[in-house]
Swiss-Prot record:
Broadly expressed in tissues including the intestine, body wall muscles, germs cells, oocytes, the rectal valve and cells in the head. The gene is dlc-1. Interacts with mett-10; the interaction is direct, and is required for the nuclear localization of mett-10. Component of a dynein-regulating complex composed of at least bicd-1, dlc-1 and egal-1. Interacts with egal-1 and unc-83. Interacts with fbf-2. This is Dynein light chain 1, cytoplasmic. It comes from Caenorhabditis elegans. It comes from the Eukaryota. Changing F62S: Reduces mett-10 binding. PANTHER family: DYNEIN LIGHT CHAIN. CDD domains: DLC-like_DYNLL1_DYNLL2. GO terms for cellular component: cytoplasm; cytoplasmic dynein complex; microtubule; microtubule associated complex; nuclear envelope. Belongs to the dynein light chain family. Acts as a non-catalytic accessory component of a dynein complex. Part of a complex with bicd-1 and egal-1, which is recruited to the nuclear envelope by unc-83, where in turn, it recruits dynein to the nuclear surface and regulates nuclear migrations in hypodermal precursor cells. Probably within a dynein motor complex, plays a role in the cell fate specification of the germline and oogenesis. In particular, it inhibits germ cell proliferation. Regulates the function and localization of the RNA-binding protein fbf-2 in the germline. Plays a role in mitotic and meiotic processes. One of its GO terms (molecular function) is dynein intermediate chain binding. It holds the Pfam family Dynein_light.
């Protein structure tokens, strides 16, 4: 297991949900190597736990500008990997 430091860059989300996002992303990074698979895992877990429709972007270099539901957005790093998770729709 690799110890990845979580650094939250921006969040509009409850503290409990933020911790869930970090925990879920940590699990995804342990299970998968491909960014698309990591994003799919996080998205599906949040759809199950917090109802659809969640969107997840995982990568090392991307820009974004998204519309999200209030209290359903987080952008954070786990080690060198950035994760954007938000609910819309």
């Amino acid at each position: 297991m690799v110890d990845r430091k979580a650094v939250i860059k921006n969040a509009d989300m409850s503290d409990d949900m933020q911790q869930d996002a970090i925990d879920c992303a940590t699990q995804a990074l342990e299970k998968y190597n491909i960014e698309k698979d990591i994003a799919a895992y996080i998205k599906k877990e949040f759809d199950k736990k917090y109802n659809p429709t969640w969107h997840c972007i995982v990568g090392r270099n991307f820009g974004s500008y998204v519309t999200h539901e209030t209290k359903h957005f987080i952008y954070f790093y786990l080690g060198q990997v950035a994760i954007l998770l938000f609910k819309s729709g």
